[in-house]
Amino acid sequence: MLNKVQSRKRRHLRVRNKISGTPERPRLAVYRSEKNIYAQVIDDVNGTTLVSASTLDKDFSAKAGSNKEAAKLVGGIVAKKALDKGIKQVVFDRGGYIYHGRIKELAEAAREAGLEF
């Protein structure tokens, strides 16, 4: 029987077989830990990370009171960095997580900041 983490990893592998980031439309990958949330814009063809943001960054303000607020700030930061590099369209990779809570807040903040997906 699979536990929660193994099920998430299995879902993520299943999704990763279907989507990949290109230089024109890179992949916005999200990882969530107990305390922090991370977002990267990845070009899978070249195997490079173009932009990244997380709650551990120096430019991240520790003013976020809750995890959802922190995810919203990270989504805005990663979108702003991507737009500064000329990236407007991405493919959203939720990393096998359910589209709810912190993942949803990050995605909606990135959309509000101007990223298209």
From Swiss-Prot:
Pfam families: Ribosomal_L18p. CDD domains: Ribosomal_L18_L5e. Keywords: Ribonucleoprotein, Ribosomal protein, RNA-binding, rRNA-binding. One of its GO terms (cellular component) is cytosolic large ribosomal subunit. InterPro entries: Ribosomal_uL18_bac-type (IPR004389), Ribosomal_uL18_bac/euk (IPR005484). One of its GO terms (biological process) is translation. It comes from the Bacteria. Part of the 50S ribosomal subunit; part of the 5S rRNA/L5/L18/L25 subcomplex. Contacts the 5S and 23S rRNAs. PANTHER family: 39S RIBOSOMAL PROTEIN L18, MITOCHONDRIAL, LARGE RIBOSOMAL SUBUNIT PROTEIN UL18M. This is Large ribosomal subunit protein uL18. It comes from Clostridium acetobutylicum (strain ATCC 824 / DSM 792 / JCM 1419 / IAM 19013 / LMG 5710 / NBRC 13948 / NRRL B-527 / VKM B-1787 / 2291 / W). The gene is rplR.
